[in-house]
C-alpha cells in the first residue's frame, strides 16, 4: 500500500512530529510506502512529491515548520482540481491520503472523501479553534512563546512606565490571547468573541498607572471594538476567502496614548508564534495523532479525523470536525476578568 501525507495551511511546531510518526508506523508496522506531497494541496494537484523513508524523518522531531512545505492552495478553486488529484494519485499508485491541517485543509479533505478519495485528517492549528478536538498541536507552543514575550516586555514596560499592547494571533478565537494573557499576568485581555469598549480598556489602564504599575494589554488580532470592525493588514483574500488581519494592537496603543497622555507601545508577535521548536506537549500530541492516523488508514476509516478527548485519541467524522469553530465561551473569559485593571 502507498499512502500520501501532506501539510496544508499555516505552518506550526509539531508538523514534522506527525510526519515522523506516520512514516515510522506506516513502514515498520504495515510495510507501506509513504509519499510526501509538497506544498499542501498543491502537491496532489501537480504531482510534486517525494518518497519518505525512515532516514528522512530521523532528525525532524524537534524541528519546527514542515519538511514538506505548505500552502493555502484550494483544489476546489482550480478548474478540474478534483480530477487532477485523482489522476495524480492513480499515476503515483497512492491509495490513501493523510492530510494535516486546520479548518480549510480539513474542509478540502472532507469534500475529497465525498468525491470518493480516501482521506484521513489530522488537526493542526495554533489557534486551537477546532471544535471536535480538545487541543490541537501547535497551540501549546504558541502560548509558551507569547507568554515568554509578555514576561520580557513587562520589564521594559516597567522600566519606562509605559503601557505595552501585545498583539497575538487569533482570527476568530481568542484562545492564545486568553491563555498567554493569564499565564503572563496581563492586566487586560481582548478576544474576538467579546467586542471591547475602548473606554473600559482606558479605565483599566489608568487604574494600573495610578498604582504606579505599567499595564500589559494582550489583544488577539481578530478582536474588535464595540461598533467597529476588524483591522486589516490587506484587503486581499486567499484561496479560502480569508483576509490578512493585523494592526489592532497598534491602533489600540495609539488610542491609549491619546486618551491617557501616557506613553504606549504596541508589539505584534506575528509569525514568531508559528516558529521554532515545539514544546514537549506538542511533540507528544503530534506524535500520537500521527500514529492514530495510520491506524485509521489501516482500518479503511476514511472521512475521519483523529482528535483528543480528555487523554484519549479518538476518531470523529470530518463533517463534524469542520462544522463549527471552538471559540472562547463567556464563562472562560469572565474567569480572567477578575485580573483586569
Curated annotation (Swiss-Prot):
Family per similarity comment: Belongs to the phosphofructokinase type A (PFKA) family. Mixed-substrate PFK group III subfamily.
Activity profile over pH: Optimum pH is 7.5 for both the forward and the reverse reactions.
Keyword annotations from UniProtKB, A to Z: Cytoplasm, Glycolysis, Kinase, Magnesium, Metal-binding, Transferase
Temperature dependence as stated in the record: Optimum temperature is 35-46 degrees Celsius.
An example Gene Ontology CC term for this record: 6-phosphofructokinase complex
Main localization (coarse): cytoplasm
Species in which this protein is naturally found: Amycolatopsis methanolica
Highest rank taxon of the organism: Bacteria
PANTHER family, A to Z: ATP-DEPENDENT 6-PHOSPHOFRUCTOKINASE 3, PHOSPHOFRUCTOKINASE
Subcellular location: Cytoplasm
GO biological process, one term: canonical glycolysis
MF term (GO), any: metal ion binding
Keyword Metal-binding appears in the UniProt entry: yes
Induction of the gene: Present when grown on glucose.
Annotated site residue numbers, Important for catalytic activity and substrate specificity: 104
UniProt cross-references to InterPro entries, sorted A to Z: ATP_PFK (IPR022953), ATP_PFK_prok-type (IPR012003), Phosphofructokinase_CS (IPR015912), Phosphofructokinase_dom (IPR000023), Phosphofructokinase_III (IPR012829), PKF_sf (IPR035966)
EC identifiers of the protein: 2.7.1.90
Full protein name: Pyrophosphate--fructose 6-phosphate 1-phosphotransferase
Protein residues bound to substrate: 125-127, 162, 169-171, 221, 265, 271-274
Residues under site feature: Important for catalytic activity: 124
Residues annotated to bind diphosphate: 10
Assembly and interaction partners: Homotetramer.
Gene3D superfamilies in alphabetical order: 3.40.50.450, Phosphofructokinase domain
Residues that coordinate or bind Mg(2+): 103
Catalytic activity: beta-D-fructose 6-phosphate + diphosphate = beta-D-fructose 1,6-bisphosphate + phosphate + H(+)
NCBIfam families: PFK_mixed, PRK03202.1
Function: Catalyzes the phosphorylation of D-fructose 6-phosphate, the first committing step of glycolysis. Uses inorganic phosphate (PPi) as phosphoryl donor instead of ATP like common ATP-dependent phosphofructokinases (ATP-PFKs), which renders the reaction reversible, and can thus function both in glycolysis and gluconeogenesis. Consistently, PPi-PFK can replace the enzymes of both the forward (ATP-PFK) and reverse (fructose-bisphosphatase (FBPase)) reactions.
Amino acid at each position: 500500500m502507498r499512502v500520501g501525507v501532506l501539510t496544508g495551511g499555516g505552518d506550526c511546531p509539531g508538523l514534522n512530529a506527525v510526519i515522523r510518526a506516520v512514516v515510522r508506523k506506516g513502514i515498520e508496522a504495515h510495510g507501506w510506502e509513504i509519499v510526501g506531497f509538497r506544498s499542501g494541496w498543491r502537491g496532489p494537484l501537480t504531482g510534486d512529491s517525494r518518497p519518505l523513508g525512515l532516514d528522512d524523518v530521523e532528525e525532524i522531531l524537534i524541528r519546527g515548520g514542515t519538511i514538506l512545505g505548505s500552502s493555502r492552495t484550494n483544489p476546489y478553486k482550480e478548474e478540474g482540481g478534483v480530477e487532477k488529484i485523482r489522476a495524480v494519485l492513480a499515476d503515483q499508485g497512492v491509495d490513501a491520503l493523510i492530510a494535516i491541517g486546520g479548518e480549510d485543509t480539513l474542509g478540502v479533505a472532507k469534500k475529497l472523501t465525498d468525491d470518493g478519495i480516501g482521506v484521513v485528517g489530522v488537526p493542526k492549528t495554533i489557534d486551537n479553534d477546532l471544535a471536535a478536538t480538545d487541543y490541537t498541536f501547535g497551540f501549546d507552543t504558541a502560548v509558551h512563546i507569547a507568554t515568554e514575550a509578555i514576561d520580557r516586555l513587562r520589564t521594559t514596560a516597567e522600566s519606562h512606565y509605559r503601557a505595552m499592547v501585545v498583539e497575538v494571533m487569533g482570527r476568530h478565537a481568542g484562545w492564545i490571547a486568553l491563555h498567554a494573557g493569564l499565564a503572563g499576568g496581563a492586566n487586560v485581555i481582548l478576544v474576538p468573541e467579546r467586542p471591547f469598549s475602548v473606554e473600559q480598556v482606558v479605565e483599566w489602564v489608568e487604574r494600573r498607572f495610578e498604582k504606579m504599575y505599567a499595564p500589559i494589554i494582550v489583544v488577539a488580532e481578530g478582536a474588535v471594538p464595540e461598533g467597529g470592525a476588524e483591522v486589516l493588514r490587506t484587503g486581499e483574500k486567499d484561496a479560502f476567502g480569508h483576509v490578512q488581519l493585523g494592526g489592532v494592537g497598534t491602533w489600540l496603543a495609539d488610542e491609549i496614548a491619546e486618551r491617557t497622555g501616557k506613553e504606549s507601545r504596541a508589539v505584534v508577535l506575528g509569525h514568531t508564534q508559528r516558529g521554532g521548536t515545539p514544546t514537549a506537549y506538542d511533540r507528544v500530541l503530534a506524535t500520537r495523532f500521527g500514529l492514530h492516523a495510520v491506524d485509521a488508514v489501516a482500518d479503511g476509516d476514511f472521512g475521519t479525523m483523529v482528535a483528543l478527548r480528555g487523554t484519549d485519541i479518538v476518531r470523529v467524522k470530518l463533517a463534524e470536525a469542520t462544522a463549527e469553530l471552538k471559540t472562547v465561551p463567556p464563562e472562560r473569559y469572565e474567569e480572567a476578568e477578575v485580573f483586569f485593571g
